[in-house]
Swiss-Prot record:
A molecular function GO annotation: O-methyltransferase activity
Binding-site positions, S-adenosyl-L-methionine: 78, 114
Similarity remark: Belongs to the methyltransferase superfamily. HEN1 family.
Matches recorded under Gene3D superfamilies: Vaccinia Virus protein VP39
Protein name in the entry: Small RNA 2'-O-methyltransferase
PANTHER family (alphabetical): HEN1 (PTHR21404), SMALL RNA 2'-O-METHYLTRANSFERASE (PTHR21404:SF3)
Organism: Rattus norvegicus (Rat)
Function noted in UniProt: Methyltransferase that adds a 2'-O-methyl group at the 3'-end of piRNAs, a class of 24 to 30 nucleotide RNAs that are generated by a Dicer-independent mechanism and are primarily derived from transposons and other repeated sequence elements. This probably protects the 3'-end of piRNAs from uridylation activity and subsequent degradation. Stabilization of piRNAs is essential for gametogenesis.
Gene name as annotated: Henmt1
Keyword presence, Magnesium: yes
Amino acid sequence: METAENIPCSMLGDNFKEVCAEKVIRFRPPLYKQRYQFVRDLVDRHEPKKVADLGCGDTKLLKLLKIYPCIQLLVGVDINEEKLHSNGHRLSPYLGEFVKPRDLDLTVTLYHGSVVERDSRLLGFDLITCIELIEHLDSDDLARFPEVVFGYLSPAMVVISTPNAEFNPLFPTVTLRDADHKFEWSRMEFQTWASQVANCYNYCVEFTGVGTPPAGSEHVGYCTQIGVFRKNGGKLSEPSASQQRDQHVYKAVYTTSYPSLQQEKVLKFVLVGELLIQVDRLRLRHQRMLREQEKERGPKPWYTDSSPAPHLLLGAVFTEAEKARIENSPKPFCEGEKFYIPLQRLLTYPKLHRLCADEDRMRSLIADSVCLSSDGSAVVVDLHNSWDYRPEDN
């Protein structure tokens, strides 16, 4: 829950001793986190594929956005090249993202440059965010900003946040919230500017904010005011021939690509690993069944109604339809000391089916990593393989 409360200045350090009779505002969660969460909620709802953060600074927002599976291109632009160099590492893939890769490719790039310069590599984006950016622009740059962002880049959606000057009297000794701010607008000033921009470039705009004022001060509005611009018609317009000409004025400072299941090497690695786990589970179960048969001195089929259902070996819960597909597929079998698991059987297990739904495709991906039967229809392993992995013991 978002809250704002008055805290005595003496609780916040020596910097405020001269105004200790005053109160200051503390937001929970912190205001910057509320702004980032607002963007994350938009991404959840609209699932953009291409997202750019103008004035990305320390790249904290980009780091939060890179986890979203819908995003395939994530770009940050900032005028401070040193910040980009020092924070690029935040966006590198973690080890876990190689072990459990994304479904879709993701490329992350940081550019050094001004947000009022045109660069054709930012054309065709679904979402552009400008979080606490415009108040840092001087009057000339502010005048150029709408034409570049809304006119030239023309994304499907733009989010702009900026301080609400009407909230400032609630802070002790505050005129502008940052020494680099060139201005801070009231709600009327921001909404007038934003509405004019929207009308000029064929957008609609809605106003909201984050940072709820403390009780008794509701009349000042949110601490941070936000405009959400959506392109009328809901579709991205095709760049014109002149726009499509390469205009690369930004300097690429950092770029990285994430492993994904769209990359054949990655898909093969994950598929083979999951397949070997499933094969070993079935092999171990068959060994137990043979031991039980020896004890009872009577032959039994590989699977009976009284034995544990094969789908339970996966350590997961399945729908009735999934169980039926597994149980109705070709059964594993033995020939001497060799254990055969049909590919059609393996394809019925949801984890493997998600990775590969086609028998021919699975065969081509695993052929040089596992032993296949002479006709290529089954994986073949030694029944009494000494592999130490025991997934059912976990």
